[in-house]
């Protein structure tokens, strides 16, 4: 299969995974923990869709490189992968999330609570997202070995 087809599948899988996962988890955090109204949360989630479409593949590449880097250092591959997913998710998503909340008119207190809550919850969410991303990549038949090769091109 040509590298372009692998790349397109990878982009599509990463985009589908990020849009679905961030919509569901973001709305839960915003409404349950950050005390945002349904309207504010829905506005935030709708604004996040085009943002997530733009950042999905760069995040996938960022995450894959962090996972590959940390896997070189550790003997516990499962634990290292989970730690890499946690770090990648929090470090990449928190600034993007804060910008989205600011853009929809959340006040500073709501932004701090939402981003802070999300960072704490991301200790679990980032790991779960890593598994969800791998599942979506599997559904789109993105081979594991080719993802590393494509990411380095």
From Swiss-Prot:
One of its GO terms (biological process) is amino acid export across plasma membrane. Keywords: Amino-acid transport, Cell inner membrane, Cell membrane, Membrane, Transmembrane, Transmembrane helix, Transport. It is a multi-pass membrane protein. Belongs to the AlaE exporter family. The chain crosses the membrane at residues 16-36, 42-62, 86-106, 114-134. The gene is alaE. Pfam families: AlaE. GO terms for molecular function: L-amino acid efflux transmembrane transporter activity. GO terms for cellular component: plasma membrane. The keyword Transmembrane helix applies. This is L-alanine exporter AlaE. Exports L-alanine. It is found in: Cell inner membrane.
């Amino acid at each position: 299969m040509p590298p372009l087809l692998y790349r397109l599948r990878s982009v599509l899988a990463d985009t589908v995974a990020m849009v679905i996962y961030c919509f569901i988890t973001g709305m839960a955090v915003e409404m349950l923990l950050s005390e945002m109204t349904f309207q504010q949360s829905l506005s935030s989630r709708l604004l996040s869709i085009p943002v997530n479409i733009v950042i999905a593949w760069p995040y996938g590449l960022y995450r894959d490189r962090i996972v590959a880097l940390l896997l070189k250092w550790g003997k516990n591959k499962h634990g290292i992968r989970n730690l890499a997913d946690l770090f990648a998710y929090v470090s990449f998503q928190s600034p993007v999330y804060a910008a989205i909340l600011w853009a929809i008119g959340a006040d500073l207190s709501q932004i701090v609570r939402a981003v802070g809550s999300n960072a704490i919850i991301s200790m679990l969410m980032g790991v779960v997202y890593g598994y969800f991303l791998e599942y979506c990549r599997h559904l789109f038949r993105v081979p594991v070995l080719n993802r590393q090769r494509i990411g380095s091109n």
